[in-house]
A protein has these predicted regions:
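Intrinsically disordered, low-complexity repeat tracts enriched in Gly/Pro/Ser/Thr and acidic residues
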Residues: 1-239, 302, 321, 325, ...
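PAZ/PAZ-like end-binding module
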Residues: 227, 234-341
């Protein structure tokens, strides 16, 4: 642990980490600006040309489709029950690529009646995955997360921002910058706490901290006395090799998690496409078989399997789930013969 190092060495290493984290933050900010304010904005403009709507799982869809009639390419999806909507790219019925999901069902919350939550960024197999920006309205303070998402979780490098009011164009009052594991600060974090004038607060320290999630504790490694120390005096800089070795050792367990592997991602989209195709094939019989109890039970079972996919974070469990889906596909072959078409 860094806090066990001699003070002189600790200060030097902490400053190097802060420089690197600032470099990563600026790099992500630049990429996110390109994704959210340029690429997705262009997709939203292009999607306005679509006029003909179809019903897709009880929701309204306007856009490009594949040969099976599933969303594929660019399009707009309006969810009937919640009035949420997604504008962006699809692959075989899945939100996949770039897009923006607006949570109309979460708008007008008691805390923030005029703020509508959304996620804009990269998607993979119906999940937030890659770089994205997430406006969060469910807490007393308005919050924004900007950074890496991994299979629907705020896992990876990013920045959490907290605002004392609903003006997100103004500076935020709290920033947490570093690596997150399912939304929780992991090990080393930069924490900036500002008052409503933009200066550092006197009661809550700002600086570079070592977090201990199990104990719920944080240890200051390098403190800032003035906001300029962070905003102007600290120059962003990539890590050198010696520091990179310390970093890799500290975060070894983090990057060895299954969701970071290509194998896990490949398996996830395979399972998602598999269950989505099965849902699509089974739901087209609904209109003429809505009173068939066996058919309805089968639909519920498939819908449950679909919800489970994004909750799994271990490769072996994904493999087991895919085996279950393959088994259900075989069962549907016999069920299909008894359905009215």
């Amino acid at each position: 642990m860094l806090k066990e190092l001699p003070n002189e060495q600790l200060n030097l290493i902490s400053l190097c980490f802060v420089q690197d984290f600032k470099y990563k933050k600026l790099e992500i900010d630049e990429k996110l600006d390109e994704i959210v304010n340029k690429q997705i904005t262009n997709i939203e403009k292009d999607c306005k040309k679509f006029k003909d709507a179809i019903i897709y799982f009880g929701n309204g869809y306007m856009g490009e489709k594949n040969k099976h009639g599933m969303p594929d390419g660019m399009g707009n999806l309006l969810f009937h029950a919640s009035e949420d909507f997604y504008v962006g790219q699809f692959n075989n019925g899945l939100k996949h690529g770039l897009g923006k999901y607006t949570y109309m069902s979460g708008g007008g919350s008691a805390h923030h009646p005029f703020s509508i939550p959304y996620y804009a960024g990269e998607w993979f197999a119906d999940s937030y995955h890659g770089l994205g920006k997430h406006l969060i309205t469910e807490y007393e303070s308005l919050m924004i997360y900007e950074g890496t998402h991994t299979h629907d979780k705020k896992t990876g490098f990013g920045t959490y921002k907290r605002f004392n009011n609903d003006d997100v164009d103004k500076f935020c009052n709290t920033e947490l910058i570093g690596y997150f594991l399912d939304g929780q600060g992991f090990k080393l974090m930069i924490e900036i706490n500002r008052d409503d004038n933009g200066s550092l607060t006197k009661n809550t320290p700002s600086g570079f901290f070592e977090y201990d999630l199990e104990k719920g504790e944080k240890t200051p490694l390098l403190l800032f006395n003035e906001i300029d120390e962070w905003e102007k005096k600290i120059e962003p800089k990539k890590m050198d090799k010696e520091l990179l070795d310390i970093f890799n050792d500290s975060y070894k367990e983090f990057f060895n998690l299954d969701p970071f592997t290509k194998e896990f991602s490949d398996l996830t989209i395979k399972v998602k496409k598999n269950v989505m195709q099965l849902m699509f094939d089974t739901n087209k019989y609904f209109e003429k078989n809505s009173e068939d109890e066996n058919y309805l039970k089968f639909l519920q079972k498939i819908n449950s399997l679909n919800k489970v996919v994004t909750q799994i974070d271990e490769k072996q469990k994904l493999i087991e789930l895919n085996e279950m889906i393959e088994k259900e596909k075989k069962e549907f072959v016999s069920i299909e013969k008894k359905l009215n078409s």
